[in-house]
Regions:
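Conserved phosphate/anionic-ligand binding catalytic regions in large, soluble enzymes, centered on
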Residues: 20-27, 103-123, 180-205, 245-267, ...
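Conserved mixed alpha/beta core segments that line enzyme active sites in large multi-domain catalysts
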Residues: 1-16, 174, 191-258
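Flexible, glycine/charged-enriched surface loops at secondary-structure junctions
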Residues: 123-134, 183-188, 317-331, 375-378, ...
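Conserved catalytic alpha/beta cores of large enzymes that bind or transform nucleotide phosphates
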Residues: 60-61, 165, 232-340
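Terminal amphipathic helices with adjacent charged low-complexity linkers/tails
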Residues: 120-147, 321-350, 357, 400
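Extended, well-folded interaction surfaces typified by the phenylalanyl-tRNA synthetase beta subunit core
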Residues: 343-347, 351-480
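Glycine/proline-enriched, intrinsically flexible loops and inter-domain linkers
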Residues: 2-4, 127-222
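Phosphate-backbone binding interfaces of nucleic-acid-interacting proteins
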Residues: 1-135, 269, 286-288, 292, ...
Length: 480
């Protein structure tokens, strides 16, 4: 135990503390007697014969982390006695969103995509993310070979070195913890942060263990130890990231133990890639290994995000660690592109399918806020679908109608009685008798009703002008 003198800003407090990492002049989180933590109220107590007037807290005791190892050390310059809420993002706002709104929207698997939706709903401007320009004066460039272009859309990577810091800022650790992730180290935390922020998975390899990158499937089945220290059976249809011929990661799923970022890592090769979603899903299922990265790749991510993610990583790293440098040119193998999608419609189409009058100005404003490019051509709207919605999401005019109406608000639709006359259908005595007979046979005589393939007369179809040559035919047409 330690008997501490703690400067609480208003006076000096006597505190008994057993934390192993306490030291003189350490700036910590302190709760005075009478204050509260998630576990309850802090009271004065006598410990080993000494009065303790408060509590020096770990991040776990404050509900900000699962780290119980020692006191939470404040990493910003703030006066003693400052409320932690004034310097860290402790107060959190939780929005409850129906999962069906997210499942098939890969752009909403990151906070920036959600922010775009809120900006459109509230008529606010979406702020751009600060990015690095990846400026580099040399000619060093990481060699990348894509051996399976059918399984890769884009592979971007860049090297960064002169990294001296190992721990991410507390503000970042708190945000990660609130999103269900624990802080590991600066580089790992940055990759997780960008994945949560942008929805784009990234992976940092120890640069000292990477010479050249080969993205390919193995020539024969092999063993591979992943970051969780588990040996995996890799088949010949599993896409791997290799250092030459040595596997260093399972593409889109998990990195390898041998290229893991460790405490003294001072240079990294950052991977920002886009892999085929079906391939990732099959490999993930076969290995019994589903990760945050694989869950996103399965949704068919936007290949345009890879370079942006690399620039974002470099910006955040250099903002935290001022000495960190871009140490190579950007390698960008853009193997396959999704086709650009343009959709043309007019206001009459919107009016017909919504039943309400949404102004042309509102249509343009809504689509623009959601990232669509809109050009007016007479009575028509020519809309270019943004890349982050063009991966099997928005493809037809009806999809555009959905975008307009959901932002307009379904609750704002007027309730209008239909003008179509509704007439009750007369019951059929034959159908009623048939159903009654079926009930008797099933309920009283324990028979089973079987619905088999229906016999049909091709000649009747031909008389009706129905083409039957290309129809699917049952080989064994015996009915029971």
């Amino acid at each position: 135990l330690h008997l501490l003198k703690v400067d609480g800003g208003d006076r000096i407090y006597d505190v008994v503390c057993g934390a192993p990492n306490v030291r003189e002049n350490m700036k910590i989180a302190f709760v005075k007697a009478g204050g509260r933590v998630p576990a309850g109220e802090i009271t004065k107590a006598t410990v080993a014969g000494y009065e303790s007037e408060g509590m020096c807290c770990s991040a776990f005791e404050l509900g900000l982390s699962d780290d119980k190892a020692g006191l939470m050390e404040i990493d910003v310059d703030a006066p003693n006695g400052t409320n932690l809420k004034d310097i860290y993002p402790i107060d959190d706002i939780i929005f409850e969103v129906d999962n069906k709104s997210l499942t098939n929207r890969p752009d909403l698997w990151g906070h920036y995509g959600i922010a775009r939706e809120f900006a459109a709903l509230t008529d606010r401007e979406l702020k751009p993310l600060p990015l690095s320009d990846l400026a580099y004066d040399g000619d060093n460039k990481i060699k990348v070979t894509v051996g399976r272009p059918d399984l890769v859309y884009r592979y971007s990577c860049v090297k960064m070195d002169n990294i001296s810091k190992n721990t991410s800022p507390l503000s970042m650790q708190i945000r990660l913890y609130y999103c269900g992730m624990r802080g590991i180290n600066l580089l790992a935390d940055l990759t997780n942060y960008i994945m949560l922020e942008m929805g784009q998975p990234t992976h940092a390899f120890d640069a000292n263990k990477i010479d050249e990158i080969v993205v390919d499937t193995p020539k024969e089945d092999c063993k591979f130890i992943t970051l969780d220290n588990t040996e995996r059976d890799i088949t010949t249809d599993t896409l791997l990231i290799q250092n030459g011929s040595t596997p260093v990661a399972i593409a889109g799923i998990m990195g390898g133990l041998d290229s893991e970022i460790v405490g003294d890592t001072n240079a990294v090769v950052l991977e920002c890639a886009n892999f085929d979603g079906v391939s990732v899903r099959k490999s993930s299922s076969r290995l019994g290994l589903r990760t945050d990265a694989s869950a996103r790749y399965e949704k068919m991510l936007d290949p345009e995000m890879t370079v942006t993610a690399a620039k974002r990583f470099a910006y955040l790293l250099q903002d935290i660690d001022k000495g960190a440098r871009v140490a190579s040119l950007l390698t960008d193998e853009y193997v396959r592109k999704y086709p650009e999608i343009e959709i043309t419609f007019d206001k009459a189409y919107v009016d017909k399918y919504t039943g309400i009058d949404i102004s042309e100005e509102r249509i343009v404003k809504t689509l623009t806020a959601l990232g669509f490019e809109v050009a007016k051509d007479g009575a028509s709207f020519n809309v270019k679908v943004p890349s982050f919605r063009a991966t099997k999401d928005v493809t037809i005019k009806a999809d555009i109608i959905e975008e307009i109406t959901r932002i307009y608000g379904y609750d704002n639709f007027s309730i209008i009685t239909t003008k179509s006359p509704l007439k009750p259908v007369k019951s059929s005595p034959v159908r009623s008798q048939s159903n009654e007979i079926k009930d008797i046979l099933v309920k009283h005589y324990n028979l089973h009703e079987v619905h088999s393939y229906i016999w049909c007369d091709v000649r009747k179809y031909k008389k009706l002008g129905i083409e039957v040559e290309d129809n699917v035919k049952v080989l064994n047409i015996e009915s029971s």
